[in-house]
Amino acid sequence: MERQPVTSSNIRSIGYDASTFTLEVEFHNGRVYQYSGVPESAYVGLVQAASHGSYFHQHIRDRYSYVEVA
């Protein structure tokens, strides 16, 4: 999945597949997670957030199932 870099102290890059509602998040520690069932509005909110890390923790981290892919 193609990801775009973001300016964040915790998150390195973010990608989204609208056909499968899958959000992919790469952290600065090198780990990559895919979150399932994420609506496009949540992805857009994450990308546009003033603080990507805060938005991620408040709206995504504990709301969607995930797997570590790297």
Label the predicted regions.
Residues 1-70:
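Acidic/histidine-enriched, beta-strand-rich ligand/metal-binding domains
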